[in-house]
């Protein structure tokens, strides 16, 4: 196992080398706190700044582009220093966390004015990639998950718990039995967590595999201790009698994993309230199984921090709410196996598909609904502001209007099952209390409406009169002194003061008291100005404190109904998805599939939804497929680049679309329940694990053969091309026979081995199809139509021509090909001759002489190389390089 040394471990050594006794009280306080947070960058509040010292300062300077300065030298040692303003700290935290650092926020927890000695400071929260609560720095259409994984190798069980702490979602599930960890990897690939917690007993060999397989996501791995008495911890936290409430009875590993995750988050939040009201146990047996290869090969959703274009999500996501987009991403990765759930969603989609006016009206209402789910999270964390409550009010208003419209449609009115009375009460309270122009800050007043609180109104009147009187003083002093440019200004240091330019200094009366001299002006005060200043500032301070108190009273009341807000968010997401599916179906000419428990997979006029979206409208070539109890295994032949892979993937994608309740990209479709989809497509070495193309291919094929059932759908593309031709044919044949005879899964097997087409005669349910090719003189046109029968040519040279290979190379390739074909005929004749030797006609010797005359020494060398080369498996670039190598040999070079 590799030994990972973090930057924090290196800093730990440096920190120990600095003696605390030589420090100021402030630095002693810093170091004492830092000792507890050596794995984090410590942001230390000093006045209006968060400061970082020592190694933290150097890292912050490098990662954030901050100026690195030095604090006072102590015993000949400089203290590196970097700081950021407190009011903009969130953006700096987000940048550090995005780069994989954890940040500890150390705040002043007492008023500096009332402090005796040094101000008391404490770490108020720790922020890691998976525990960001500032939603302004998160992608609104993606969840930010943190996950925890535990493994029991004795019983072959893995448990995974995960949560998005900005939305309150908290789920857990267990995977048991054969290939448990492979399935766990697939689920982790779906979750795409930004941080993964590993318990201290997790087996290293599994963790290394986990890191290798999902390292491309840029995940932060964190080791955490196991929570003792995990079940008691959870029942205590959620204030429940039994864990059975969450369907977790006897699921010890799921309980322990959930406790580890919850405890970690709770510790980082330093006792702040969390948004979790329940743990949802997820039964993944009710979800279609999609392994990592299938998820990636089919381009279902983008990887973390990548755009959705070119994925199924990119095609299907025209949702108009953030909650809808986030939920859609989840359901694409987790297609239903429950036919009732599929048909229920289909019913809603169908209703909106047929009622265009209703659909467009609903989508217009939804456009004005904000991210209720994350606003609810902000209310729980206490980070909400006046703007958030106004957004919530508007969202409730639009939701209630939508509810009213849907109530007129009896068949679908239950889709927006919300707590109307509670939501209306929240709306009315926000409308009564919150100023429509409320600022973002909750500490500076201006949030609460006039007329709501009599004491607040009184203070505002005092403040206004005081400010009016100050304006009167300004006008009076201008007239008394004759200084037209005299101004009364305010700052936090001096309060209110009179400012006079140097040019008018000689006009200043004797009763003015000088407070400050500037380059171009002087600042003064007068007794009655200070008298009213005290009234204004006192009133302002009281106003801000009272407004904050009233604001928090309101949000506390709303917090008591937080479950109703989460319920609203969930219903809005589902409504958005089904109306979106109807919108997409209309826009892209999709059809409602017939889905059921039968065994027939039939798609007429099928298209690849992703490819179709990337090419000009109407240019995609449609194709059919039918797989049933008579023919459930297609052997698909045809040239490279002719559309075999696209055809196979479009079938898989349409199956998935049907299982999430969407319409499909076809003219009509009948799709059975498919429990698992497997795809083995493409050839590339796995650089992370050091596996060759062939080894990787065989590993994935083995997994398919061990896990597929007769309810599965399998896509195999060019199996066996990573080894020699005869080995490849043998393996491909055996795999095809095994799937046909032992598994019975619906399968499309694309191959360049034309020998496999003979299996149609041997395997009862196998059938040959090919990609149609039209030969027009010397040119070849790939029609991209799938027709019955096997292909008899590879058209490899034509593919090379389309790839831009130089004409000289193509011409030479044709000559070589003709010679090879001649040789093939000669060899076939030789075999016949060997059969005739018994009759003594000397045919064998004659053929050998003819072969010798046809091929020179260099040509024989080329022939030998070609015999061992799998031309159909080469990419265009590889073909070009190989052809160039052969050319050098033919003109007298070498193959060195």
Curated annotation (Swiss-Prot):
One GO biological process this protein is involved in is:
mismatch repair
Q: Name one GO cellular component term.
A: cytosol
The entry's keywords: ATP-binding, DNA damage, DNA repair, DNA-binding, Nucleotide-binding
Residues engaged in binding ATP? 638-645
Single GO MF annotation: damaged DNA binding
Answer yes or no on keyword Hydrolase: no
Please name one Pfam family that this protein belongs to.
MutS_III
Query: Which HAMAP family does its entry note?
Result: MutS (MF_00096)
> What family does the Swiss-Prot or TrEMBL record give for this protein?
Belongs to the DNA mismatch repair MutS family.
Biological function? This protein is involved in the repair of mismatches in DNA. It is possible that it carries out the mismatch recognition step. This protein has a weak ATPase activity.
Name of the featured protein: DNA mismatch repair protein MutS
Q: Which organism is it from?
A: Fusobacterium nucleatum subsp. nucleatum (strain ATCC 25586 / DSM 15643 / BCRC 10681 / CIP 101130 / JCM 8532 / KCTC 2640 / LMG 13131 / VPI 4355)
Gene behind this chain?
A: mutS
């Amino acid at each position: 196992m590799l030994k990972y040394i973090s930057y924090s471990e290196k800093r730990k050594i440096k920190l120990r080398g600095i003696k605390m006794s030589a420090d100021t009280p402030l630095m002693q306080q810093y170091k004492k706190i830092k000792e507890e947070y050596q794995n984090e960058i410590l942001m230390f509040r000093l006045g209006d700044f968060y400061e970082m010292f020592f190694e933290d300062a150097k890292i912050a300077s490098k990662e954030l582009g901050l100026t690195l300065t030095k604090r006072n030298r102590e015993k000949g040692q400089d203290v590196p220093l970097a700081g950021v303003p407190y009011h903009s700290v969130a953006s700096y935290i987000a940048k550090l966390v995005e780069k994989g650092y954890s940040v500890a926020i150390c705040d002043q927890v007492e008023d500096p004015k009332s402090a005796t000695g040094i101000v008391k400071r404490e770490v108020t929260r720790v922020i890691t990639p998976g525990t960001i609560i500032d939603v302004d720095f998160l992608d609104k259409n993606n969840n930010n998950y943190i996950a925890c994984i535990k493994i029991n190798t004795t019983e072959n069980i893995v448990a995974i718990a995960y949560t998005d702490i900005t939305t309150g979602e908290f789920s857990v599930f267990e995977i048991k039995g054969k290939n448990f960890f492979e399935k766990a990897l697939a689920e982790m690939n779906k979750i795409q967590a930004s941080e993964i917690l590993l318990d201290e007993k997790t087996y290293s060999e599994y963790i290394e595999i986990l890191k290798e397989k999902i390292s491309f996501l840029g995940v932060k791995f964190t080791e955490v201790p196991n929570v003792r008495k995990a079940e008691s911890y959870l029942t205590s936290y959620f204030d429940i009698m039994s864990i059975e409430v969450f369907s977790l009875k006897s699921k010890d590993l799921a309980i322990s994993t959930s406790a580890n995750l919850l405890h970690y988050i709770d510790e980082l939040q330093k006792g702040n309230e969390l948004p979790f009201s329940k743990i949802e146990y997820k039964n993944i047996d009710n979800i279609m199984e999609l392994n990592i290869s299938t998820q990636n090969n089919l381009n279902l959703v983008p990887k973390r921090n990548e755009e959705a274009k070119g994925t199924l999500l990119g095609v299907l996501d025209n949702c108009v709410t953030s909650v809808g987009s986030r939920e859609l991403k989840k359901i694409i990765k987790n297609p239903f196996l429950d036919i009732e759930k599929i048909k229920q969603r289909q019913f809603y989609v169908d209703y909106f598909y047929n009622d265009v006016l209703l659909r467009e009206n609903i989508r217009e209402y939804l456009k004005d609904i904000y991210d209720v789910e994350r606003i609810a999270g902000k209310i729980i964390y206490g980070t909400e502001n006046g703007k958030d409550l106004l957004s919530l009010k508007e969202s409730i208003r639009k939701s209630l209007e939508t509810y009213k419209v849907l109530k007129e449609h009896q068949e679908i009115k239950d889709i927006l099952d919300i707590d109307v009375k509670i939501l209306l009460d929240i709306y009315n309270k926000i409308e009564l209390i919150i100023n429509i122009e409320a600022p973002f800050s909750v500490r500076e007043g201006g949030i609460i409406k006039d007329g709501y609180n009599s004491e607040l109104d009184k203070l505002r009147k005092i403040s206004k009169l005081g400010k009016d009187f100050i304006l009167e003083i300004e006008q009076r002093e201008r007239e008394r002194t004759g200084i037209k440019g005299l101004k009364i200004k305010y700052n936090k240091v001096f309060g209110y003061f009179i400012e006079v330019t140097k040019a008018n200094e000689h006009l200043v009366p004797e009763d003015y008291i000088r407070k400050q001299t500037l380059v171009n002006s002087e600042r003064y005060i007068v007794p009655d100005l200070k008298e009213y200043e005290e009234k204004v500032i006192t009133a302002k301070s009281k106003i801000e404190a009272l407004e904050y108190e009233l604001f928090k009273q309101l949000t506390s009341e709303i917090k008591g109904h937080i479950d109703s807000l989460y319920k609203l968010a969930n219903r809005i997401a589902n409504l958005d998805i089904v109306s979106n599916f109807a919108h997409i179906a209309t826009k892209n000419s999709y059809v409602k599939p017939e889905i059921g428990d039968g065994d027939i997979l039939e798609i007429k006029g099928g298209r690849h939804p992703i490819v179709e979206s990337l090419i000009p409208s109407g240019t995609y070539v449609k194709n059919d497929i039918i797989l049933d109890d008579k023919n459930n295994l297609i052997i698909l032949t045809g040239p490279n680049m002719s559309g075999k892979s696209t055809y196979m993937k479009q079938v898989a994608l349409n199956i998935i679309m049907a299982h999430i309740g969407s319409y499909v990209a076809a003219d009509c479709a009948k799709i059975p329940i498919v429990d698992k989809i497997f795809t083995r497509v493409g050839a590339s070495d796995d650089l992370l694990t050091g596996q060759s193309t062939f080894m990787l291919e065989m590993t994935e094929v083995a997994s398919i053969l061990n896990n597929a059932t007769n309810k599965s759908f399998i896509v195999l593309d060019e199996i066996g091309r990573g080894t020699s031709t005869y080995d490849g044919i043998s393996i491909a044949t055996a795999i095809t026979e095994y799937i046909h005879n032992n598994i019975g899964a619906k399968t499309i097997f694309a191959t360049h081995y034309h020998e496999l087409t003979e299996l149609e005669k041997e395997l009862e349910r196998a059938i040959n199809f090919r990609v149609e090719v039209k030969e027009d003189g010397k040119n070849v046109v790939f029609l991209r139509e799938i027709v019955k029968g096997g292909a008899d040519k590879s058209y490899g040279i034509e593919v090379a021509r389309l790839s831009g290979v130089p004409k000289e190379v193509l011409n030479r390739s044709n000559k070589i090909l003709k010679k090879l074909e001649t040789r093939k005929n000669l060899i076939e004749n030789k075999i016949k001759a060997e059969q005739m030797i018994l009759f003594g006609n000397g045919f064998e010797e004659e053929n050998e002489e003819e072969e010798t005359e046809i091929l020179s020494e260099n040509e024989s060398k080329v022939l030998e190389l070609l015999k061992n080369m799998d031309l159909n498996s080469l990419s265009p670039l590889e073909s070009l390089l190989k052809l160039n190598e052969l050319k050098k040999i033919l003109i007298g070079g070498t193959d060195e």
